[in-house]
């Protein structure tokens, strides 16, 4: 895929990802360079106590300040505000949102971009629940929670997307800004609300099947508090959309 005249800002919120960060950055550089695409990676670290920011600074020295942009914050303030913070510093006209824990393989980013260009879609979302998409590394309980949450979300919200709880997506920058401005949720529910608001705005959404792999290094941030918050916000969205 030759350079297409666009620039892609890859937003990567981090918290305690010092072991994963060098690998995910290396993979992003590999696949974006091979595709001939113009890009930057914006690392938004929320005061990680494990030294993630120091690792990011070392990676910036290796790949250059034009490719690795550091925009840290002092404390853990949530995904939604992390994206808002990152967008303020993004110089691309498209935004890619990706997790830093290696759950999302950067090899899919060029596929997102190719599909977006073919249909001029506003959003391209990675899906674990359509085509040859799937999840690897989760135990039965985690799969059941994810499937159940996604099914319930589909029934209540009808978002016209098969994977409402995923977070690996490509947005037109202005579309992302408008969706975020409409959102009230924080944490993991934020991703779900984004697609619901996109549907309300009439934006077009396409999907690319992805393989989601559970993190190798570090610990998952999903806990009981997040699940309860998810349920509350799901009911709120159902009542207001």
Swiss-Prot record:
CC cofactor note: Binds 1 divalent metal cation.
MF-aspect GO terms: dolichyl-phosphate beta-D-mannosyltransferase activity; metal ion binding
Pfam families (alphabetical): Glycos_transf_2
Binding-site list for GDP-alpha-D-mannose: 13, 15, 17, 44, 46, 99-101, 128, 215, 221
GO annotation terms (biological process): dolichol phosphate mannose biosynthetic process; dolichol-linked oligosaccharide biosynthetic process; GPI anchor biosynthetic process; protein glycosylation; protein O-linked mannosylation
Listed cofactors: Mg(2+); Mn(2+); Ca(2+)
Enzyme class (EC, first level): transferase
EC number: 2.4.1.83
PANTHER family cross-referenced by the UniProt entry: DOLICHOL-PHOSPHATE MANNOSYLTRANSFERASE SUBUNIT 1
Function: Transfers mannose from GDP-mannose to dolichol monophosphate to form dolichol phosphate mannose (Dol-P-Man) which is the mannosyl donor in pathways leading to N-glycosylation, glycosyl phosphatidylinositol membrane anchoring, and O-mannosylation of proteins.
Protein known as: Dolichol-phosphate mannosyltransferase subunit 1
């Amino acid at each position: 895929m030759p350079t297409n005249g666009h620039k892609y800002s890859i937003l990567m919120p981090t918290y305690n990802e010092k072991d994963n960060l060098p690998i995910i950055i290396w993979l992003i550089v590999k696949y974006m360079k091979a595709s001939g695409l113009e890009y930057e990676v914006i690392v938004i670290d929320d005061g990680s106590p494990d030294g993630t920011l120091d690792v990011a600074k070392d990676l910036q020295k290796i790949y250059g300040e034009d490719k690795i942009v550091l925009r840290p914050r002092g404390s853990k303030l949530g995904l939604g505000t992390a994206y808002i913070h990152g967008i303020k510093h993004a110089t691309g006209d498209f935004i890619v949102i990706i997790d830093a824990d290696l759950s999302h393989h950067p090899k899919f980013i060029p596929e997102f971009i190719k599909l977006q260009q073919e249909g001029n879609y506003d959003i391209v979302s990675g899906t674990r629940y359509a085509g040859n998409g799937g999840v690897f590394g989760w135990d039965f309980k985690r799969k059941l929670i994810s499937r159940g949450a996604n099914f319930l979300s589909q029934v209540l919200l009808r978002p016209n997307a098969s994977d409402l709880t995923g977070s690996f997506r490509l947005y037109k920058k202005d579309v992302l800004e408008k969706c975020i401005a409409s959102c009230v949720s924080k944490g993991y529910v934020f991703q779900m609300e984004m697609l619901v608001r996109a549907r309300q705005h009439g934006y077009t959404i396409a999907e690319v099947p992805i393989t989601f792999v559970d993190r190798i290094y570090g610990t998952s941030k999903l806990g009981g508090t997040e699940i309860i918050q998810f349920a509350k916000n799901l009911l709120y969205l159902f009542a207001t959309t």
